[in-house]
Structures are given as structure tokens and as C-alpha cells.
A protein has these predicted regions:
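Acidic, mature catalytic/reactive cores of soluble proteins
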Residues: 1-328
Length: 328
């Protein structure tokens, strides 16, 4: 994982090796293998499935930003929109199963807070070798796994050889109380619940019956992944500073609501009979503080804020050398 901002799209990153190799990453993969054999989303979902082949066997890794039953008031990302039956659990869950042979799995979690500026400080939670807390730049999250964890300076590491049929997991939690799956069964259940959430959502869509249906479904799921449920806003992209052309300077921070882009994306969902997101976005607009002449800005923060002052991070090398890296 090369990019993750928590607890929201526009929060400072904890993993940003997408923009600089030293700015934090999270690996959960076979030891010594850097390139997967296959990678795709579980059909009808935003659960990522990665298949790894090694000289000694095969494993399959699943990654999910998990969804669960609405727990009540959300103190992590406060809602201004009415709640739905499901809501974000504020955790990233990763599971692995050995399909064949024996495969050594490598867990390396090396966050670097505030866009690579602050290395993590780790402690074992309550002395438990299966739970470690990372803190920095005013943020804290918990890593929990059925692998034994060891602290190596600003990173945590775990290794284990999986036998055929054996499963393992790790979970990163920034939820209230740093709640995280207690065992692999719990982790798999949360991924399964997330799968059901996505399939239930896309099941409401009116998809055309032709050879582009799969691509349309995948596009709809991507758009839904760009919506911010607490306010109804949508972002143009979950990333910043990826150039329009290789090595170019047109590399903006798109983690905000651009009025034109959001209109097009929600029009696409409306055409598929997925109207709730469009309704929520209209309410988001209605809640915005107007300008002095009553007009709308071209963009807003996902919480409705108007001031999105831009800064640059000259200490980051940029995506494939594309600079500057822009924030805001």
C-alpha cells in the first residue's frame, strides 16, 4: 500500500511512497517477491484480491476498507447527513490464505505521518506482541495481527510461513477505541460483510445488457468509492500530485469537491438509477456557506470549507519525479 490518508480523503497521509519512497508504505506479501501474479477486484465490490505465486506455493491476499452496521454517532468523521444502515468501520483489513505449497509471508508496516515528515513511534499495546500502536503528528492508529510483531525503529515487522489452507491477517485501525479484529475469523467476517455491502449497493443499479456492462459496473463502484458519506461530498480523486503527463507540472491536489467533476460523476450514477448519492450531494451544496455574491466556488473541502490554501512539499521527490507535490 503506497497511499493512505486517515481518517478522511483530505487528511495528511500516513503512507505516501506513491510520492516519495521514504514517505511510508505497508507491505503484506510473500517474502522476497515484489510483483504479484494477478490483481483484480472481487466481482461487484471494491475488495481488492491479489494473487501471488512463489517458487514454493501460492497465496491470495484480500484488502478491504471495511464497512459494517451503523454503530451510532461517529466521532472520527462526524456526519451531517442522515446515517444509512452501513457505515465505515475506520479500518483497513488484510487477509491471506495459502492455496498451495508453503509460502513465507512478510508484514512490514512503516508509516510516516504528515506526508512523510514524521516517522512513526511504535509501542506494543499492553505488551501484546500481536498489537502495536503507532503515533505521530497528532495521530494514532493500531496494527493488529495473528502474526507476532516486532518493532524495528519506525516500522513494525512480522514473518510467518503459511502451510496449505492456513490463513493470516493484519488490520490497521483508527476507529474509536482503536477497535480491530481479534482473530482471523473476525477479520474474514468483516471482509465478507464489506463484500455484501458493495454487492447490495451495485445490485440497485440499472445496468445495460451488453459487453460494456462490466466496465460500467466497475466505473460505478469507483465513483461510489469517491463519495464521502458523512457529508455527501464527492472527490475528484483520492490522491494528490499525480501528473496529467509523465514528469509534468500539472499535478494538482484533487482530494476535494470540484463542482463540475462532481456534477458529471453523479449524473452518471443517476443514469444507473443510483440516486441516493445525487440527493446527498444536492444537500451538501445546500449546506455550503455562499460567497458574498451568492455564487459557488469551483471547489470545496469535503466538509464544506471554502479555504483550501495550496502549499508545496519540496522535500518529496514526486510521482516518478513530477514536482512540485501540492497540498491544498
Amino acid at each position: 500500500i503506497d497511499w493512505l490518508c486517515i481518517p478522511s480523503f483530505d487528511a495528511p497521509s500516513v503512507f505516501a511512497s506513491l510520492l516519495d519512497r521514504q514517505a511510508g508504505s505497508f507491505r503484506f506479501a510473500p517474502i522476497g517477491i515484489n510483483h504479484p501474479s494477478a490483481r483484480a477486484y472481487e466481482p461487484g465490490t471494491n475488495v481488492l484480491v491479489t494473487t501471488w505465486k512463489t517458487p514454493s506455493g501460492w497465496v491470495v491476499v484480500r484488502d478491504a476498507l471495511t464497512m459494517g452496521p451503523y454503530p451510532g454517532e461517529d466521532s472520527i468523521t462526524p456526519h451531517t447527513r442522515p446515517p444509512t444502515d452501513y457505515d465505515a468501520e475506520h479500518m483497513l483489513v488484510r487477509t491471506v490464505v495459502c492455496i498451495e505449497g508453503q509460502v513465507g509471508i512478510d508484514l512490514v508496516c512503516e508509516p510516516c505521518f504528515d506526508y512523510g515528515r514524521t516517522p512513526a513511534e511504535w509501542t506494543l499495546a499492553d505488551g501484546d506482541p500481536h498489537m502495536a500502536d503507532a503515533s505521530g503528528a497528532g495521530q494514532t492508529f493500531r496494527l493488529r495481527s495473528n502474526l507476532a510483531l516486532g518493532i524495528e525503529s519506525s516500522r513494525v515487522r512480522g514473518r510467518h510461513k503459511l502451510e496449505p489452507g492456513e490463513r493470516a491477517y493484519c488490520a490497521l485501525s483508527w476507529a474509536k477505541g482503536l477497535e480491530a479484529p481479534a482473530d482471523v475469523e473476525d477479520a474474514e467476517a468483516r471482509v465478507a460483510a464489506t463484500t455484501r455491502f458493495w454487492r447490495s449497493w451495485i445490485g440497485r443499479a440499472r445496468l445495460p445488457d451488453h459487453h460494456f456492462s462490466e466496465a460500467i459496473q466497475r466505473s460505478a463502484l469507483a465513483i461510489k468509492g469517491l463519495t464521502y458519506m458523512p457529508t455527501g461530498a464527492t472527490v475528484a480523486a483520492p490522491t494528490t500530485s499525480l501528473p496529467e503527463t509523465p514528469g509534468g507540472e500539472r499535478n494538482w491536489d484533487y482530494r476535494y469537491t470540484w463542482m463540475r467533476d462532481s456534477t458529471f460523476t453523479l449524473q452518471a450514477l443517476h443514469g444507473l438509477n443510483l440516486d441516493m448519492e445525487a440527493d446527498e450531494f444536492i444537500q451538501f451544496i445546500a449546506d455550503l456557506e455562499p460567497t458574498e455574491d451568492g455564487s459557488l466556488q469551483i471547489m470545496y473541502g469535503i466538509d464544506g470549507r471554502r479555504d483550501l490554501t495550496e502549499s508545496t512539499r519540496d522535500d518529496l521527490s514526486g510521482y516518478e519525479g513530477a514536482r512540485p507535490v501540492r497540498i491544498g
